[in-house]
């Protein structure tokens, strides 16, 4: 039995540009990721952006990508979201969704 595309495990890196630091963006990203059952990480960069990696079923990752592009935390202002290094994976590299300091 083959898995549907929506159930295929994928990994994707992301970087979010805009007013995304000092507005609890990482905390909300972690909470949304966990709610969707995704694993990965999120951290602030020295350039004022937020970056990280998402892993999980493709359908859930797509949902999270849309959330990162359009929603974020209540006080954030997202200019744009960049997604790269997307690939199909056999197993998850993480066990949780973490905030990296």
From Swiss-Prot:
Keywords: Acetylation, Hydrolase
Catalyzed chemical reaction(s): an acyl phosphate + H2O = a carboxylate + phosphate + H(+)
Organism, scientific name: Bos taurus
N-acetylserine modifications at: 2
Record-level Gene Ontology MF annotations: acylphosphatase activity
Residues annotated as catalytic: 26, 44
E.C. numbers: 3.6.1.7
Highest taxon, organism lineage: Eukaryota
Family: Belongs to the acylphosphatase family.
Residue ranges of every copy of the Acylphosphatase-like domain listed in the record: 11-101
Residues of the signal peptide: none
Protein name: Acylphosphatase-1
Pfam family, one: Acylphosphatase
Gene, per the UniProt record: ACYP1
SUPFAM superfamilies: Acylphosphatase/BLUF domain-like
Keyword Nucleotide-binding: no
């Amino acid at each position: 039995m083959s898995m549907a595309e929506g159930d295929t495990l994928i990994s994707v890196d992301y970087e979010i540009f805009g007013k995304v630091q000092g507005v609890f963006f990482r905390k909300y990203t972690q909470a949304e990721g966990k709610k969707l059952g995704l694993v990965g990480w999120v951290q602030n960069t020295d350039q004022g952006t937020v970056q990280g990696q998402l892993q999980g079923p493709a359908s859930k990752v797509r949902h999270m990508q849309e959330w990162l592009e359009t929603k974020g935390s209540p006080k954030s202002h997202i200019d744009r979201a960049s997604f790269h290094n997307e690939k199909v994976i056999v197993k998850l590299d993480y066990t949780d969704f973490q905030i990296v300091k």
